[in-house]
A protein has these predicted regions:
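Residue-level detector of functional hotspots within protein domains
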Residues: 3-4, 22, 64
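Active-site-proximal beta-alpha core segment in soluble small-molecule metabolic enzymes
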Residues: 34-104
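A short, N-terminal amphipathic alpha-helix
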Residues: 21-29, 69
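Generic N-terminal amphipathic, Lys/Arg-enriched alpha-helix
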Residues: 1-12
């Protein structure tokens, strides 16, 4: 099969480039003594999460589904944030989050 025969849309992921960037980020975090928290808005390619998980970064999530995705594929260090929460959603938010932020 050639690249022109692949079903579209598709993404080409260069694992070596992802790892190079994650190595750089991890190095900066270590030298600055800070914690890295990945935003799903910046990387929603969940098929890469097995690579990201190796680096131990936390993640941010703004929905129940993002929280579940983070818990299942990334880390226990999950920061929930939203301008508003519903009382009905709070049990699941607390179940999947390690931190809850109330922002505007």
């Amino acid at each position: 099969m050639t690249i022109n025969q692949l079903p579209t849309p598709f993404y080409i992921i260069y694992e070596d480039r992802i790892r190079r960037n994650l190595d750089l980020i991890a190095d900066v975090a270590a030298r600055a003594d800070v914690e890295i928290i990945m935003a799903f808005k910046a990387n929603a390619l969940w098929r890469t999460f097995n690579i990201v998980r190796e680096y131990g970064f936390g993640c941010t999530a703004s929905s129940i589904n993002e929280l579940r995705l983070g818990r299942e594929y990334l880390t226990d260090n999950i920061h929930a944030y939203s301008p508003a929460y519903t009382e009905a959603d709070f049990p699941e938010i607390l179940r999947y989050s390690s931190h809850v932020t109330f922002n505007s």
